[in-house]
Structures are given as C-alpha cells and as structure tokens.
C-alpha cells in the first residue's frame, strides 16, 4: 500500500488559514467532479444529505458502502478498502449516534465504536497515498457545558464535555486532533467541522435514539392520533438552542472541501436561536396538535443557552437556507412517509 510520506518541515498541506486562503484554491473540489469521493456513513442523516448534494452538483464517482459491505470499526477491512479504491476525497460522516440517554446507557459501546471508526478512516486515508483532502465531521458536543455563548472554536478542551455527552464527544474531539496530527506530521490536508444540533430527513425517531425535534414530532403526532388533551415536556421551556438543517450542513461540507484548509476545526450552526418553548410551539403547529403543552419545570432542561459561533464558516461564503419551521415541516413529511406505516403510531 502506498503511504503518505512524513513531512520533514511540518504541515506541507497547510493550504489555507481560517479564512480559507492559500493553496486550497489551486486544488478545486468543485472542479474535480470525476474524482473518486468516498462518503463514509452515506445511509445516515448527514451522509445521505451530503450524497444528495454531491449528486445534485454532478459528481460522477461517489463511492459508498453499507455497513454489511464495509465495517468501519474493523481496521483491516478499512485498510483493504482504501488500498483497493484509492479515493481522492474522503468525507467521514459515519458514527454510532443516539441521544444522551442512549450513550449513557452504553458508554463503552459508543466510545469504542466511534473511536475505532475515526482512527481507522483517518489513518487509512493518510496511509493509502491517494487522498488529497479529508473532512471529519465532529459535533458541538465537544464543548464544555460552561463554554462562552455563542461558543467559538477556541473553547475546545477548555473544560470537559457536558455530563452525559462525553461518550460521544471524546471520539469527536479525537477526530479533530487526528486531523491536526496527520496534517502536522504527514502533510495531509485534513480538516474538521463541528455542526450544532442537526435535524432533517433520516433523523432517528425511536425514543432511545432521537433528539429534541424528532422526539417532539413523534409525541405530538401520537397525541393527535390518540386525542390526548396535553403533552408533557420537561423543563420550563426557557432554555435557548439553535438547530441546523442537515441540507445546510451538506452545503457547508461542499464549501469546506472547496475553500478551507486550515488547521482548526470550523463550527457550523444556523444562527437561528429559539427557546425550547418556541420550538415546541412550532412543532405543535406543524403537526396540527390542538392540545396543551404542559411544562414540567421540576424536570431538568440542560444548560440555559447553547449556540455556536459560526463566523469562520460564514467568512467562507456559507449561509444557511432552511428556516426552522420549514425544516420541521420537511422532517414531519419524512416521518409520515417513512415511520407512520409501522411502530410510529403505537410506540
């Protein structure tokens, strides 16, 4: 297997700075649409959105594998795949995902599998010798619970991740640091992004895996079908969050592959900040549930505010397009098409 040579003078592929300037312009991702692009995790919410975006842009050589075809947690299988396929671009969107309750219930499983996926893909991309650019998708769970708001990229490792999030966050932090390490030691143009509170088609709906928007959709829809007079929601509803539609992230991925080659990771957030109460009312309206939302202020609701500073991403020319209510409608349509023929009515 050909391997990436160690850089004798540090990061030979440090093609750009925080604004995406420098040598990155000499190698155009959008001008290389016949090159082989490997999307790891193409069946998930993020990977499928990236796949749709590349197809729409006319990329003709996108390579994907199901988990049955390629177990990304198996080092030998990943190395054999890279040696055979020799992709030019790699986008790592694969992960074992679930809410805080799921990862807290199986911490070793989440930590180990996500570390293996990250290490295997980044190392194989570095070793195979064909990869021109690698993008690792992390998560805003990497930041401490007491990070400044909006949270800048520089808040990474200024404290531990929020309690309960660490089993998912630690492998994501490792992915960012691996990108920096292979860039410094081998000159590979490896970059990372940290999207915030993603939602969209293919978001999991089972209670043990879902996040707030799909959970609210499922609960309000069930209450509407059953004629329930109220739906209980934890907390006071005062906590503020931002939510980023996965199609906006897919556009950000293309922008990053085209314009960014900096060492530091990049936040990706919509900038549309809402309270959980406003979110619940928006979901209730989209679903058409006419009952009451009963707020249980005795229950925990997390940190008071969680928003990321996406100024670096916006300097690259990216702007989110999907308004929150439109995104909720999009996800509800997906839920009705793909979930409501089976357990979604009764779970």
Curated annotation (Swiss-Prot):
InterPro entries linked: Epimerase_deHydtase, GDP_fucose/colitose_synth, NAD(P)-bd_dom_sf
Record-listed substrate binding positions: 219, 234, 241, 301
Catalyses which reaction(s): GDP-beta-L-fucose + NADP(+) = GDP-4-dehydro-alpha-D-rhamnose + NADPH + H(+)
Pathway the protein contributes to: Nucleotide-sugar biosynthesis; GDP-L-fucose biosynthesis via de novo pathway; GDP-L-fucose from GDP-alpha-D-mannose: step 2/2
Residues binding NADP(+), per UniProt: 41-47, 172, 195-198, 211
Function according to Swiss-Prot or TrEMBL: Catalyzes the two-step NADP-dependent conversion of GDP-4-dehydro-6-deoxy-D-mannose to GDP-fucose, involving an epimerase and a reductase reaction.
Oligomeric and partner information: Homodimer.
UniProt protein name: Putative GDP-L-fucose synthase 2
Species for this entry: Oryza sativa subsp. japonica
């Amino acid at each position: 297997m050909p391997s990436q040579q160690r850089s004798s003078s540090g990061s030979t592929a440090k093609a750009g700075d925080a604004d995406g300037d420098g040598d990155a312009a000499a190698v155009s991702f959008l001008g290389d649409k016949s090159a082989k692009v490997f999307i790891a995790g193409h069946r998930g919410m993020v990977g499928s959105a990236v796949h749709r975006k590349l197809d729409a842009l006319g990329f003709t050589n996108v390579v994907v594998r199901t988990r049955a075809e390629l177990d990304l947690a198996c080092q030998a299988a990943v190395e054999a795949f890279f040696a055979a396929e020799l992709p030019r671009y790699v986008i790592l969107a694969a992960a074992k995902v679930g809410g805080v309750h799921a990862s807290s219930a199986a911490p070793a499983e989440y930590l180990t599998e996500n570390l293996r996926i990250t290490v295997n893909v980044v190392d194989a991309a570095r070793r195979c010798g064909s990869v021109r650019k690698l993008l690792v998708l992390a998560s805003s769970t990497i930041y401490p619970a007491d990070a400044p708001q909006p949270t800048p990229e520089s808040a990474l490792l200024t404290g531990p991740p929020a309690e309960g999030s660490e089993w998912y966050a630690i492998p994501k932090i490792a992915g960012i640091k691996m990108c920096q390490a292979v860039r410094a030691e081998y000159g590979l143009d490896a970059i990372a992004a940290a999207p915030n509170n993603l939602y969209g088609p293919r978001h999991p709906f089972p209670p043990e895996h879902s996040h707030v928007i799909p959970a609210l959709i499922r609960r309000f829809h069930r209450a509407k079908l059953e004629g329930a007079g109220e739906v209980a929601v934890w907390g006071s509803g005062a906590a503020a969050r931002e939510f980023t539609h996965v199609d906006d992230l897919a556009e950000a991925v293309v922008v990053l592959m085209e314009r960014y080659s900096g060492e530091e990771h990049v936040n990706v957030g919509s900038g549309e900040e809402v309270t959980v109460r406003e979110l619940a009312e928006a979901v209730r309206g989209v679903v058409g549930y006419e009952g009451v939302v009963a707020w249980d202020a005795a229950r925990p609701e997390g940190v008071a505010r969680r928003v990321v500073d996406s100024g670096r991403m916006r300097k690259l020319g990216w702007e989110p397009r999907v308004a929150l209510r439109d995104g909720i409608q999009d996800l509800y349509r997906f839920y009705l098409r793909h979930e409501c023929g089976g357990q979604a009515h009764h779970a």
